[in-house]
Amino acid sequence: MPLEVVSFDMEGTLIEPRFSELIWEHDIPRLYAKRRGLTLEEARRRVFAEYMEIGDERPEWYDIEYWFRRLDLPGDWRELLEARRGVIRPYPEVRGVLERLGERYRLIVTSNTMREFLEVQLEGLREFFTHVFSAPSDFGEVKKTAGFYRRICDIVDVEPTSMAHVGDHWRFDYLTPRSMGMEAYYLNRGGERRGIHIVHDLEEFEARIRELDG
């Protein structure tokens, strides 16, 4: 079946991961240190231990509002996201690829990032996408499972074989969607891996899609 929809992962695919890394690894420990009167090093150790206690198999892991409550952090998490807006960086080729592919296909975002983050991260890019899906926010799932992809296909009214997807997680962006018949590609920006369904930037992905679809 001809392709109708092209799906993109978010962090590491469309934008650099710096925004989330700073919030989870620096800002939250910094606020915790301020609240508890700790050094940043000790605060980071305690906060990371709290993260591990929850673990990434639970939706709370991804929920910044939950962590502000759990850690009794000062301030408003929304203000923190706004304060870090300036570090958001799309990869250089992203806008051009979206402009060109958007002329032929419906474009969507499928991410396991919370919607609160996505809304900030997508500033300047939102116009390209007909739908933006967050696994934890929209479906209460912590990973991009086969069930997650099936629900997306139902919502956008397309068969899996008419959707392409690209992302930087081997299992959740490549193996899982590919097992359902999607034209999935693993994005390896570091260039360490090579293969017929491995691409190293989104321009290479675009070229593969155009070859596939004639």
Report residues per predicted region.
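Asp-based, Mg2+/Mn2+-dependent phosphohydrolase catalytic module
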Residues: M1-V6, E16, E99, T110-G214
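Short, surface-exposed alpha-helical recognition segments that flank or form part
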Residues: R85-R89, V109, G140
